Amino acid sequence: MTKTLPKDFIFGGATAAYQAEGATHTDGKGPVAWDKYLEDNYWYTAEPASDFYNRYPVDLKLSEEFGVNGIRISIAWSRIFPTGKGEVNPKGVEYYHNLFAECHKRHVEPFVTLHHFDTPEALHSDGDFLNRENIEHFVNYAEFCFKEFSEVNYWTTFNEIGPIGDGQYLVGKFPPGIQYDLAKVFQSHHNMMVSHARAVKLFKDGGYSGEIGVVHALPTKYPFDANNPDDVRAAELEDIIHNKFILDATYLGKYSDKTMEGVNHILEVNGGELDLCEEDFAALDAAKDLNDFLGINYYMSDWMQAFDGETEIIHNGKGEKGSSKYQIKGVGRRKAPVDVPKTDWDWILFPQGLYDQIMRVKADYPNYKKIYITENGLGYKDEFVDNTVYDDGRIDYVKKHLEVISDAISDGVNVKGYFMWSLMDVFSWSNGYEKRYGLFYVDFETQERYPKKSAYWYKKVAETQVIE
């Protein structure tokens, strides 16, 4: 049976400042930790990325032409405050005013994120969000933006608090490149959630117009053998690390007993302790019912198996299928079911996982108000022929995820939109330029844009709300 989506559903495309803009030192922009980290550790940099800093009018014109009526944009904190605090950079402020004006001119609603992996270097090198002073700096930056950019109707505090802690302190593929420090992972999650809560409360108390929420990456975690209690436990612990700890902070304003039992077990095995203060919980509690929406970023699921051994994680950054490894002491290891498709980067493609995650939010956090799927898409080594890409695999992937969103809406969940990652090809944090996600192909040499087959398909779905 053909499935449909509501008439007012947003069909969006997603971007991020550092992955799209380029111009990393232009017009007074301050450095971010990624600048040097990429130079030192990877075979690519964020220059020129998709040159969105100069070419946003082209991308927004294409958006309008192809039925994309929403865009996720992030503000580069170091374009506004080059050192994260103190002096404002007027050219950065002007750039974002111009960008938002162009969005509205093209009838593409901007959903604006304050922090998308790019803490200014001056603050990042001083502990990033492990340093509680950074909470104050973030809240001050947020307040400046709320006041300055009154044309924005949808604000997001953070993009993917989970993968930041994971990338910086567990896998070590994000600066500062620390591995296997679970206490830092949870502390980073916690301090960022306090920052989120403080900013949301400030937004509501300040009477600013518009809506505010947060974007969480929520990869669904399943036991490899659902009949084995040890595998079930491994999936629960892995879910606490990546999802439940952060969701509890967002919607409960505290960590449930079950969550803390899991956290304490993980830290007992791996070492370290957390600094959780009473005023933190007061801040979390004050904001728990104020979130206007939850953004869910979903690409894949994981299956967990009980495991007794030392932690070892190998990140597959080059798309060499089967080269990744993930096992955490006292938690478990990822083991892929044979019958579920995987990408070259070992991502397990399972649309049902998105449905299950959406239903989990509704069941466990009934004070959620609405959901946007703020990222979902398929990374490919695209083959550019005839000035396009015949990306049927991407179409199939997005179609199946839109279908489960339709199912979730039918089953009573308030899902209001979908943002495909990514609007145009951008650079990927830990995979460079080979892994493409866009609706529009970018020739990174010339910066020309070419609509892919998926763009024409997406346009039809956006115009008809019929998924076929």
Curated annotation (Swiss-Prot):
Pathway where this protein functions: Carbohydrate metabolism; lactose degradation; D-galactose 6-phosphate and beta-D-glucose from lactose 6-phosphate: step 1/1
Alphabetical UniProt keywords: Glycosidase, Hydrolase
Cellular component aspect of the GO annotation: cytosol
InterPro entries per record: 6P-beta-galactosidase, Glyco_hydro_1, Glyco_hydro_1_AS, Glyco_hydro_1_N_CS, Glycoside_hydrolase_SF
GO biological process: lactose catabolic process via tagatose-6-phosphate
GO molecular function, one term: beta-glucosidase activity
Binding site for D-galactose 6-phosphate: Q19, H116, N159, E160, N297, S428, W429, K435, Y437
The family this protein is said to belong to: Belongs to the glycosyl hydrolase 1 family.
Record-given protein name: 6-phospho-beta-galactosidase
Organism of derivation: Streptococcus pyogenes serotype M2 (strain MGAS10270)
